[in-house]
From Swiss-Prot:
One Pfam family recorded for the sequence: PCP_red
Assembly description: Protochlorophyllide reductase is composed of three subunits; ChlL, ChlN and ChlB. Forms a heterotetramer of two ChlB and two ChlN subunits.
Full protein name: Light-independent protochlorophyllide reductase subunit B
Reaction catalyzed: chlorophyllide a + oxidized 2[4Fe-4S]-[ferredoxin] + 2 ADP + 2 phosphate = protochlorophyllide a + reduced 2[4Fe-4S]-[ferredoxin] + 2 ATP + 2 H2O
Chain positions recorded as substrate binding sites: G425, L426
Binding note for cofactor: Binds 1 [4Fe-4S] cluster per heterodimer. The cluster is bound at the heterodimer interface by residues from both subunits.
Cofactor or coenzyme needed: [4Fe-4S] cluster
Keywords for this protein: 4Fe-4S, ATP-binding, Chlorophyll biosynthesis, Iron, Iron-sulfur, Metal-binding, Nucleotide-binding, Oxidoreductase, Photosynthesis
Similarity section: Belongs to the ChlB/BchB/BchZ family.
Enzyme class per UniProt: oxidoreductase
Pathway assignment: Porphyrin-containing compound metabolism; chlorophyll biosynthesis (light-independent)
Stored HAMAP family: ChlB_BchB
Amino acid sequence: MELTLWTYEGPPHVGAMRIASSMKDIHYVLHAPQGDTYADLLFTMIERRGQRPPVTYTTFQARDLGGDTAELVKKNIKEAVERFKPKTLLVGESCTAELIQDQPGALAKGMGFDMPIVNLELPAYSKKENWGASETFYQLTRTLLKEKVGSSEKISPLRWKELGRRPKVNILGPSLLGFRCRDDVIEIQRILSEQGIDTNVVAPLGANPNDIERLIDAEINICLYQEIAEASCEWLKRNFGMEYTNTIPIGIKNTIEFINEVHNKLDLPLTNKKELEHKSKLPWYSKSVDSNYLTGKRVFIFGDGTHAIAAAKIAKDELGFEVVGIGTYSREMARQVRATAKELNVEALITNNYLEVEDAMKKAAPELVLGTQMERHSAKRLGIPCAVISTPMHVQDVPARYSPQMGWEGANVIFDDWVHPLMMGLEEHLIDMFKHDFEFVDGHQSHLGHTATKTKDLINSDNKKDNNPKEGIIWTESGRAELTKVPFFVRGKVKTNTEKYAILRGIPEISDETLYDAKAYFS
C-alpha cells in the first residue's frame, strides 16, 4: 500500500459506479463503510449531474463488525430493490468491505429476485478505476446476452445488404467521468450519419439493460474508448462474430483513418479524402504562416492511454511539435503507449505517481505540457503552459458548451486548447523581454491601472531570484539582461545549465559572455 496526496485513478468500485451511473434502470448495491460514500461527489461536483448516482451503500460502522454484517447486506439489497425497482442489479464491495469477505453478490443471488444480478468481484488492492469500469461493463454485457450465445449464426458485417437497410453500428465505451464523452458521442454519431450509417446503441452512456440485449442487432462495434470497451468488444467478437474498430477518431488523420476503417469493414464506398480534410480548420491553420512559430515546439504528454497516444500523433503529424516525453497511468494500455514511444524515439513513462511525472517533465524541459489535472498543477509550478487532454479532470474541464475531442469539431477544439497556451506564452515572453523599456516604466503601464508593479521593485525581485548564494554564484547585470531575453518557458533550464557550467568552470560571476559560453557547451 502507498500513501499519497493525489491519485490518477480511484479504486475499481468507482469504475463500477461510473458504469451504473451512466446507464438507466440499473442499481448498484455497494457493501462499504460510511467513509466510502465520498464517491458521490465525483458525479455531482465534477460531472455536475442533476441527480445522485444510483448506488445504495450498506454503510456499516465499527460497531457492526461485532455482529452479522451479512444480514446488513441483505437488508440493504432488499430495500434497494423495493425502492428503486431496477431491471438489473449490480452488487459489489469496496476495498474496505473486501477484507470482511461477506460475498454480497452471492447473498443477492440467493434472495430469489426475478431479475439479472451481476456479481462484481473487483480486486481492490491490485486493480484500479478504469479496469473496474471495463470489468463491470464486460460482466453486464455477458450476463444480459448469455442466453443468446450459440443461438444464432455469427454476425456478418455485410448483413445490412442482405436485409436491404442502412448499416448499423454500436458505439461502446463512453461513460460518465470520461473526458468529454458526452460531446464525443454526438460528434461521432454525426459523422456516421453523414456516411449513411445508423447508430444502433450507445453504451454504457445513456443505455438501459434492453439496449445491451439489442447490441447484436448491429453489424459492427465502434470501440470508442479502449480502456472501457475493449474487453466487451472482444467478447462480442468471440461469441457473435462482431467485428470492432481499433482506430480512435481524435485528430484529422485519425478521423479519416477511422472513417476508412468503418467503410472497409462494412464494404461501403469510401468518401473522397480531400473533402474530408476540409471538414476541420486544423489542417489549414497548421499550414499557414501564422502557425510557423509553433513548428518544433517541445511537448510532454501524459494521460490515459487512449488520449495520450492520440495526442502524440496529432502533435507530431498534424502540428509539427517535437514529442519529448509520453506516458500513461493506465497499466492496461502500457503496451500500446510503449509502442508509440518507440516510434517517437522516447522512453515511455508508466506510473501512477504524480511526483515521478513532474520529475520527468522537469528533465524533459518542454515548452508545452498535455496532461491531466495534476500535470496542470505541476506545469504551473514549473512555469510551463499546459492543456488538459485526459481524466482525471477538474470541473473546469467539464464545460457546459459543446466541446468534443473526437471528429472534425474535436480537432478544432484541440487546436484552440493546445495552441492558445503557446500564444499566450509568447505574449508573456514579449512583455517580460521588454519590461525595462520606457513604455513599461512607472507611469506608462496604463493597461495595469492601479495594480501596476513598480519597475524598480520588479528588477529587485528578479535580482533576488537570479543570485544563487548557496553555490556562491552571482549574476551580473549583463547576465541578467541576457537571461530575460530567453523565453520564460525555457528560461529555467537555461539558467540551471548556465549555473552548472559556471560551477564546473569555477566562475563566480555570470555575465552575458558566460551565458553564451554555456549555450555553446551544452549545444
